[in-house]
């Protein structure tokens, strides 16, 4: 079955289960859920299509229904967990379907059943959904969820403790409302004590979760100041870096990076980290994680390195670790123990920056951003020589990023490509800030690449149609690419052949007006600066359309004002120019015709004003005011009509789509009904045939039963005979085995006896030597007593020092007590071992007795065998005598029988 039919079957099964929650309906729904899980439809559910949305809504309703069976609930949670593995689907489930509150209610319902798998799966799914997501504590079931999590964390440790800690860390991170709610509870001090006790846990993931919750709740309070004080912060850093390098997996590494990034936002802790003596070795271990790790771990490590770059002194150390000390022997060795093998960090960064567009993580963007930071620091510090060899490695990767794709990309991949190109251009712009690096960059850049790239961005961003959406993220990234490309061209126009002519040609292109006006009216500071630099270059040119730029800026400002006044409405701002292409829509053509008529009226009025005398200026100005009011009214009417037309067109397209979907669904349902009717007829015909076969087989089975009973009685008799034979064989084999075992045990015991006698002799020798040593020690003790008398005098002088050391002695006494307890435990174990040794000696004695008895039995059996052999010999001799006598008798009787033919057995 295809995905569409499977989802329809799922919707039908859910509807049937809602109407009647019977076992049969539950079984059908369970099978449909397993089918959907097996198909792996994550991308289909991530789309905004109607059928997957209905399926998700029905699944959420199943979780909300308290009468849903636990088996169906668990299977539904498994399906949603597999779908939530995709980040876009997870965000949709949280934001659109309110799954977080539904799962919180589910946890509240199952909170009394601790060992239920539904509770564990729900908490794990909540942990995945709430990662890097802010949840309002005033939402439904969230306060109950927080109370449950705190109770479970403070309860004895079980399998729920770790996911509860992770979920609590997600809820408290960057969420002031949840933090305030937790701090307002009465049992928060006990909760803090429990979290602090978890810092000594053997599982590194539990330690990270507990430390993350403590950092979120207590970082700016008295408890946090004690916990992250300068006396303890170095141990905390060592613990965090240890977990980061030697963590249990990607999940632990994610939370460790988030924790360290949150701590770096505190200026005191950032200052402590700059003074941390082992930061260099820890940084090399962290850079080593970029080599040979998965994309998830690499992206989190890159985020951490970018967070280090936010601190000036740490950025300098990071630059030295990446460039200056790369490849040095021992660069990756630190105090962290068995870390990962570290290749040159810059080579690993080049590898991650060349990641493909289809990769799920944004490692390429982060790696390029990190290159930008370290290159900028190298240029500022005047140490570009260390970075030169890595520039040659990076430039081919950047050129590959700037290439135009061969095929058309979808919107998500196109936006991702634009972001990556923008980051690559940032790196090139930074490299052009130093002459040597700038020369290396200009050696590989050509004009055609920039011209084709700017043309491609003009075409794919919709600038050719002179219409843009101000709130479109793709348009913003395309604008950034165009502006940064022109900024880079302006920096290298004197060093690359034909670059200057191409640069000024693009500046005079009317398509540049839309992105330039957007940049000048943007809220982003860097975008405004880039737009101003380009404007200063373009303004003196004769072909630059400055009037159109002014109109575009005014239109953007009007749109921004309208958006601030009416934020829910989002319309497109249209900029018309004389060089624009004519649109194809009839509605837009009418609007363009009316706008041209207005332009003609304005021109006529202007020419009329030039012909008229100055005496009629007042009247003409009044007429102009009237016309301006009419023009503004017409413009507002046109915008409203355009909005209505767009809304109606959208509604009509949605209605057509719904009608088409309904017709398709109806046709598919009718086809399925026909198939089911045909299947039902076939099954009825098969049932009749099978009933006839069943009757004939019943008759044959009755005959077979009688034959089987006769054979069974005969087999019983044979089985009894076989059982007796087998018993005799088994008893004979058992006796042989026992005899062989006894012989082996006797030999082993004899060998052990010999060893024990040797050990006894050695113990006697040791005893004699110990006596001699004892006499020597007595003599030494006498000497020590004399020394002791001398030392007592010295001890009287040191009584003052002893009073200061008494506190330390108390601690040592406690340790001694623990050692004494351990000693007592060891003595108990020694007593137990002695008892076991005595038992083994008794067993040895019993075995020796058994061995002696077996030897006696053996001698008796040998004597009996000798007697029986003697008797057999005597009988044989008597038989021989009898045979001779019979032969003599036959010979005397006439020799009719030969002696050879005599039957001796008689």
Curated annotation (Swiss-Prot):
Keywords: Chromosome, Coiled coil, Cytoplasm, DNA damage. It comes from the Eukaryota. A motif (Nuclear export signal) lies at residues 599-613. Transmembrane segments: none annotated. GO terms for biological process: chromosome organization; DNA damage response. It is found in: Cytoplasm; Chromosome. GO terms for cellular component: chromosome; cytoplasm. One of its GO terms (molecular function) is protein phosphatase inhibitor activity. The keyword Cytoplasm applies. SUPFAM superfamilies: ARM repeat. Homodimer. Interacts with topbp1; forming the CIP2A-TOPBP1 complex. This is Protein CIP2A homolog L. It comes from Xenopus laevis (African clawed frog). The lineage of its organism: Eukaryota, Metazoa, Chordata, Craniata, Vertebrata. The gene is cip2a.L.
């Amino acid at each position: 079955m295809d995905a569409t039919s499977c989802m329809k079957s799922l919707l039908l099964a859910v509807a049937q289960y809602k109407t009647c929650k019977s076992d049969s309906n539950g079984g059908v729904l369970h099978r449909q859920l397993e089918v959907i899980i097996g198909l792996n439809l994550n991308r289909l559910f991530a789309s905004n299509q109607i059928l997957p949305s209905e399926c998700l809504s029905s699944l959420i309703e199943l979780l909300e229904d308290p009468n849903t069976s636990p088996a169906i609930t668990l299977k539904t949670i498994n399906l949603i967990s597999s779908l939530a593995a995709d980040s876009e689907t997870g965000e949709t489930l949280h934001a659109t379907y309110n799954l977080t509150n539904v799962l919180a209610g589910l946890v509240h319902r199952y909170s009394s059943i601790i060992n239920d798998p539904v509770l564990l799966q729900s908490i794990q799914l909540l942990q995945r959904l709430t990662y890097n997501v802010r949840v309002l504590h005033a939402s439904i079931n969230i306060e109950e969820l927080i109370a449950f999590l705190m109770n479970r964390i403070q309860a004895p440790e079980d399998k729920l403790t770790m996911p509860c800690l992770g979920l609590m860390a997600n809820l408290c991170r960057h969420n002031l409302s949840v933090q305030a709610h937790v701090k307002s509870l009465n049992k928060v001090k006990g909760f803090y004590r429990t979290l602090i006790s978890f810092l000594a846990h053997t599982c590194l993931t539990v330690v990270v979760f507990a430390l993350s919750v403590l950092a979120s709740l207590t970082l700016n309070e008295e408890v946090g100041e004690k916990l992250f004080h300068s006396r303890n912060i170095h141990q905390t850093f060592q613990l965090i870096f240890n977990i980061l390098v030697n963590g249990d997996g990607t999940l632990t590494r994610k939370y460790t990076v988030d924790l360290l990034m949150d701590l770096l936002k505190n200026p005191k802790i950032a200052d402590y980290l700059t003074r941390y003596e082992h930061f260099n070795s820890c940084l090399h271990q962290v850079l080593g994680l970029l080599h040979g790790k998965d994309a998830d771990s690499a992206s989190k490590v890159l985020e951490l390195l970018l967070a280090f770059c936010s601190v000036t002194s740490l950025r300098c150390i990071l630059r030295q670790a990446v460039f200056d000390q790369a490849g040095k022997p021992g660069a990756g060795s630190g105090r962290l123990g068995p870390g990962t093998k570290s290749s040159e960090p810059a080579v690993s960064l080049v590898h991650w920056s060349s990641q493909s567009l289809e990769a799920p993580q944004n490692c390429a963007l982060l790696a390029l951003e990190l290159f930008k930071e370290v290159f900028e620091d190298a240029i500022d510090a005047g140490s570009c020589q260390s970075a030169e060899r890595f520039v040659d490695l990076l430039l081919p990767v950047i050129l590959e990023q700037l290439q135009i794709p061969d095929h058309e990309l979808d919107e998500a991949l196109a936006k991702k490509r634009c972001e990556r190109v923008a980051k690559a251009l940032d790196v090139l712009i930074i490299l052009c800030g130093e002459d040597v690096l700038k020369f290396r960059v200009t050696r590989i850049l050509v004009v055609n690449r920039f011209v084709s790239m700017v043309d491609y961005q003009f075409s794919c961003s919709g600038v050719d149609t002179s219409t843009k959406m101000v709130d479109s993220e793709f348009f913003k990234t395309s604008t950034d690419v165009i502006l940064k490309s022109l900024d880079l061209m302006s920096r290298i126009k004197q060093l690359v052949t034909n670059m200057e002519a191409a640069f000024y040609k693009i500046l005079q292109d009317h398509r540049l007006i839309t992105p330039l006006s957007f940049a000048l009216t943007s809220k982003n500071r860097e975008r405004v600066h880039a737009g101003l630099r380009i404007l200063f270059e373009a303004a003196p040119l004769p072909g630059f359309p400055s009037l159109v730029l002014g109109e575009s800026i005014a239109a953007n400002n009007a749109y921004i004002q309208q958006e601030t006044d009416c934020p829910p409405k989002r319309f497109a701002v249209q900029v018309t120019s004389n060089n624009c292409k004519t649109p194809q829509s009839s509605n837009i053509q009418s609007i363009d015709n009316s706008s041209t008529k207005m332009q003609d009226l304005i021109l006529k009025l202007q020419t009329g004003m030039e012909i008229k005398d100055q005496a009629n200026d007042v009247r003409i100005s009044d007429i102009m005011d009237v016309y301006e009011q009419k023009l503004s009214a017409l413009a507002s009417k046109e915008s409203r009509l355009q909005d209505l037309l767009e809304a109606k067109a959208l509604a009509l397209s949605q209605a057509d789509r719904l009608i088409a979907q309904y017709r398709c669904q109806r046709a598919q349902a009718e086809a399925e009904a026909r198939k089911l009717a045909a299947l039902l007829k076939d099954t009825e015909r098969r049932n009749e045939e099978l009933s006839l076969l069943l009757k004939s087989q019943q008759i044959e089975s009755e005959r077979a039963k009688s034959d089987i009973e006769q054979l069974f009685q005969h087999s019983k008799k044979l089985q009894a005979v076989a059982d007796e034979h087998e018993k005799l064989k088994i008893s004979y084999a058992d006796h042989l085995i026992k005899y062989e075992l006894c012989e082996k045990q006797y030999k082993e015991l004899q060998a052990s006896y010999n060893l024990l006698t040797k050990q006894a002799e050695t113990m006697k020798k040791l005893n004699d030597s110990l006596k001699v040593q004892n006499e020597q020690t007595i003599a030494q003790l006498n000497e020590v007593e004399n020394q002791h008398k001398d030392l007592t005098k010295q001890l009287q002088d040191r009584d003052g020092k002893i009073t200061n050391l008494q506190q330390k002695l108390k601690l040592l006494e406690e340790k001694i007590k623990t050692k004494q307890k351990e000693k007592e435990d060891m003595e108990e174990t020694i007593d137990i071992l002695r008892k076991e040794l005595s038992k083994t000696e008794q067993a040895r004695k019993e075995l020796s007795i058994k061995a002696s008895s077996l030897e006696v039995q053996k001698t008796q059996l040998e004597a009996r065998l000798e007697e029986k052999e003697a008797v057999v010999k005597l009988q044989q001799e008597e038989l021989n005598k009898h045979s001779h006598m019979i032969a003599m008798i036959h010979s005397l009787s006439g020799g009719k029988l030969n002696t050879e033919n005599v039957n001796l057995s008689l």
